Amino acid sequence: MMFIGRQEELAELDNLYSTDKFQCVIIYGRRRVGKTTLISEFVKGKEALFFAATENNSDSMREEFCNRMYQSLNAPSIGTLDSWQSVFQFIAKETRDRRLVLVIDEFPYLAKADKEIKSVLQNVIDHYLKNTKLFFILCGSQVSFMEKEVLGYNSPLYGRRTAQIKLEPFSFFDSREFFPKYDIEKQIQAYCMLGGIPLYLSQFDDNDSLEDNIKGKILRKYSYLYEEPKNLLKQELREPMNYNAIIEAIATGATTLNNIVGKSKLPSDHCSKYLKTLMELLLVEREIPVGEPKSSRRGIYRIQDAFFKFWYRFVFPNTSELELGMVDDIFNEEILPELPKNYGQGFELVCHQHFLRELKEHRLPFRFSHIGRWWGNNPVMRRQEEIDLFAAGKDGAYIGECKWRNEKVDKTILDNLVCKGQQLFPAIDNKVYVLYSKSGFTSEVKRIAKKDNSLILYGLEDF
């Protein structure tokens, strides 16, 4: 399969490699995000030793590592070395004048099997490796572990890295490259269902319609995506049943702790613990109105992974019927009527990403420091209001609406947005209004935008 995206990360790795000096690079990110694919692309044409740690004991892993080491280095075997210290000293001798990429994937497994490995690495980096030509990559999927136990200040490895790369899911603009045969609308729809995880994106075939992909690649019980969320949770967690209940509760509309407790039927303290774990896995996030402190009581829980959100909304509650092969029934009755709502929510994220790109390309009248959604009380109308896009900086704020509908955006929508902006943010002098529309704008709105610098319009053709 063609290598897609990650050009910045690949360029950074190539730049570090070209120094011909010792490097220790930490690469981490949630499962399925493409860490191994990035590393595999990077090591093409380079001498490399790749070792993936497993949930095994340290001695068994050291034996496997030594076997791979002798084979990769084309060195005569002297058997399994008696310690990891000896292993890395051997590598240090081999790489004094030899550029080698050493990759230890799933490092948290090794660190949990051998409590001393981090201190061993600290010692060998300081006394043996730093004057070699070794290009050392430590890779892991347990994000919280990598941040605390590898990159954290209290880790023995603190200060030993020369670079770190946290791989994030693809934005829409990288994800769309998986579907070059789809038009922009279908590309957005696919992204709203699959999110930015490369492995999920690669399952869809843009030679087929979206409907056929949903049925064949998600709802069909033999497909990879049909059981992916369940399998991933089993791999990461000991009590997947309780986590299933929480994720399903959020996917079907519960956003506060009280609502999640009510829907999942789990005790409040258990829910809090499980939510913390899901946030560490980057599957759930706590969203707060943009500009408010993290401690804000108005925070809500939402599923961070778009595919998990889709799966727990439509697949998980309909498993019994899907096991019977009732794919068409579930699609037509349960999914098809709800897809516009799903696309509308996903479109907001795509608009945020587009607006950030506009900032990066210097196409906006002023910079902003944070972007997101805003919700809260309207003191004038005495009701709750939502703003799809709110981006503020020292020179003003952008206030936006993102419309995924078949009708053109008209002046009524514009007037409502301006009214909300004036009522909700009276202290902000410089307000620029932003409208995103799937179906374009009426001629009246276009005329206003031509004359008014405080209004910006974006259609799908601008993506």
Model-derived segments and spans:
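A cross-kingdom feature that marks ATP-driven nucleic-acid transaction machinery
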Residues: 299-463
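Phosphate-binding site recognition
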Residues: 1-333
